[in-house]
Amino acid sequence: MSTEGGFGGTSSSDAQQSLQSFWPRVMEEIRNLTVKDFRVQELPLARIKKIMKLDEDVKMISAEAPVLFAKAAQIFITELTLRAWIHTEDNKRRTLQRNDIAMAITKFDQFDFLIDIVPRDELKPPKRQEEVRQSVTPAEPVQYYFTLAQQPTAVQVQGQQQGQQTTSSTTTIQPGQIIIAQPQQGQTTPVTMQVGEGQQVQIVQAQPQGQAQQTQSGTGQTMQVMQQIITNTGEIQQIPVQLNAGQLQYIRLAQPVSGTQVVQGQIQTLATNAQQITQTEVQQGQQQFSQFTDGQQLYQIQQVTMPAGQDLAQPMFIQSANQPSDGQTPQVTGD
């Protein structure tokens, strides 16, 4: 082996001094070898023989060949270690690292065949830590079911179109809630109400032009006042209310001469307290309010005036301000 291409300089470190005297010392040991020295080797001969047999061209191995290979490998390892230790001392460290061996291989041409086996760490691109990406699936829409503190009241509205089948829909409302109903063109919608105890809901829907109300009172006809009573079982009973002649005359006088009035989409929700009345009206034209008293009850007539020239049927509802405790609502219909 040649010592050309080694480290230069006049450094007096222990590793450099050992390297300078390495080959003269090795040559002296080889000259002084005897037969006894070949019997004991620092490297295991069996492993060397196994490596030699990996070559398919090798048929037989002589007894001296493994001994020579073991001695040569020992010298090679010692020289490489000394050159790596020089790099360790230059970095002021006391521990031999893999990077030191890689630097020794790079700086010495004789060890070029080991560059691919022992690469330098700094020549490697830094390993990026792979970020663990957890695939998050979109959460499916979750349906929440909850119950309000107040027990809801079901209102069932049944509508029947002219010449079509009957369809029904159920709406749940809370106490004090207001619903606005708008009739469709050419549709007559009778309303069925189911309310709980202590709450009254009145739904009024106007009929389109050309259709008659269920109860009509024209010229020369009598007017009948119906009172709705809701029983404990939820059934609605209509009981005729007897009014005196003065009250009927007052109601007739409150009606306009020509049938040009209509109430559209009016819903009145009466709270449990008879003094609180919430009204929402969808209307056209002007409104007229008339009131009359019968003893301790106050009746209110609400009307909407439409432009002249429109012959529309007129529903009229009378609401009593003094609501009875059993949830009764007087109602008057006419045109």
UniProtKB/Swiss-Prot annotation:
One example GO MF annotation: DNA binding
GO terms under cellular component: CCAAT-binding factor complex; nucleoplasm; nucleus; protein-DNA complex; transcription regulator complex
Stated family: Belongs to the NFYC/HAP5 subunit family.
Record's function text: Component of the sequence-specific heterotrimeric transcription factor (NF-Y) which specifically recognizes a 5'-CCAAT-3' box motif found in the promoters of its target genes. NF-Y can function as both an activator and a repressor, depending on its interacting cofactors.
Identification of the protein by name: Nuclear transcription factor Y subunit gamma
Matches recorded under Gene3D superfamilies: Histone, subunit A (1.10.20.10)
PANTHER family in alphabetical order: HISTONE-LIKE TRANSCRIPTION FACTOR CCAAT-RELATED, NUCLEAR TRANSCRIPTION FACTOR Y SUBUNIT GAMMA
Subunit text: Heterotrimeric transcription factor composed of three components, NF-YA, NF-YB and NF-YC. NF-YB and NF-YC must interact and dimerize for NF-YA association and DNA binding.
